[in-house]
Amino acid sequence: MPTTFADSPTRFVSAANGIDYAYRETGEGARPLVLLQHFRGNLDNRDPALIDVLAATRRVITFDNAGVGATTGTTPNTVAAMARDAVDFLDAMEIDQADVLGFSIGSFIAQEIALSRPAAVRRLVLASSAPQGAEGMHGWAPDVIEAVGSRVPGPEGVLKVFYAPSPASQQAGQQSLGRIYARTDGRDKATTWETRLAQYDAVCAWGIPNHPLLQRVSAIKVPVFVANGDSDPMILPHYSYLLAGLIPQAQVKIYLDSAHGFLFQHHTEFAADVEAFLND
């Protein structure tokens, strides 16, 4: 098994739902850590530095959900349907139980998996997340949409949303982008505009204020680590505290001078925190 993300080839697995899922595996271990990706992200939009630190002690699996990147099928426009597609991937991989790390929209999907298939999740990490039905989550601010929602988002938009405006955070963002773009062979297919539209519809529906749905997340009984950057403009940090307060076995950490991409900027610290949490 490859020990670095840069050396991990893209493989495919066929699921019972008729979808061929693109995925990569890095590291070794009995129980996998499955990663669920952010808005518009494919296999290549993860910082290899984070994957490599996580994979030093465990088997890490990254994959494109239905309709994303090289995976076949169509991206649905609800989080619940995305979670069903993710569970179909786990079944195709013959993974009965995993630790799950969801980032951004991937954290919404991770919550839904923990609620709909609780036996499949041992421990849950929710990065840049919010509970369904939270007030103020129905859509993003115009400057955020302009930065990451355009037809061809560039590095300037990523730096604006994923990193704090400080020189240190912006420099860390440039370094992370350099690592992400370093892979030249076997790169994933770009995420389509149709997937972008479907994912944003799902995010907006997740954020419709609804108090009964807000309470749903309290049914998650596994240990949960909630994390975010202190300057995230996409999913504001106070939602991390709300989420952790609703989940019985949750802990929360906010990383300083960072934003939506805090886990890339602080990859060493975050990976160490995840390692300690998963081994607790």
Residue ranges and their predicted role:
Residues 115, 122-154:
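Flexible "cap/lid" loop of the alpha/beta hydrolase fold
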Residues 9, 187-213:
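Hydrophobic, aromatic-rich cap/lid helix
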Residues 231-235:
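Acidic catalytic loop of the alpha/beta-hydrolase fold
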Residues 15-72:
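Conserved HGGG/HGGXW glycine-rich cap/lid loop of the alpha/beta-hydrolase fold
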Residues 61-101, 272:
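Active-site loop/oxyanion-hole signature of alpha/beta-hydrolase fold enzymes
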Residues 220, 226-228:
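Short beta-strand/loop motif that positions the catalytic acidic residue
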Residues 102, 106, 110:
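Gly/Ala-rich beta-loop-alpha elbow adjacent to hydrolase catalytic centers
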Residues 250-280:
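Catalytic active-site module of serine/aspartate enzymes centered on a nucleophile-bearing elbow/loop
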